[in-house]
Amino acid sequence: MNQYQPLSSVWYGNDAELLEQVLNFYPRSPPETIIDTTFNKGRFWKGSERKIISVDIDPQYNPDFVCNNSDMPFLDSYADVLIYDPPHLTDCDTQNSSKIWKDRFGLTSNFKGDNICSTFDPFMKEASRVLKPEGMLFCKITDGVHNHRFQWNHIDLIESGKKFGFTACDCIIKARKVSMTSSKWQKAHHARRYHCYWIIFRKSNRCE
């Protein structure tokens, strides 16, 4: 039996290292089927030896499946673990948005408005279908400010998960060295964001 290794609620390393620890820590048995539903360039898996099924809406990244993650071509109760990393900025497909967001998220944003929460319910519904009972959903999410209003994205994500049979079981804060702030905002009346969250969901009404 492997010796217990505690996992800190604050993470200072990169996402790939954190995901490896998370995958060893939370699932009740070693996961066999892992789907990254927002694969992009695969940065979460650099150096990993795990077999990952990659999904992305943008074909330029050569994912295993080119599709919208709200309508994935998998059987019901197919996967042990899903990974979800939605866009962190509002209107990230607009003409004046930074190129890095288009490069990172491809065509994932086709909506307009003050927040990204309209994407949560369609994804959560599909994630609930694709995951096995007791399966795990690991979501990276960042709160933000748009139109001078704070966007509580991680809370909206948790509330969305509840609608479709998920329980939010844990939260890891990932600390950053630089803030996630648009370069056009030199002054702001909100605290700069130097962190994001990894929310740990289980497709169950319990966590333990």
Annotated model-derived regions:
Residues M1-E208:
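Class I S-adenosyl-L-methionine-dependent methyltransferase catalytic core
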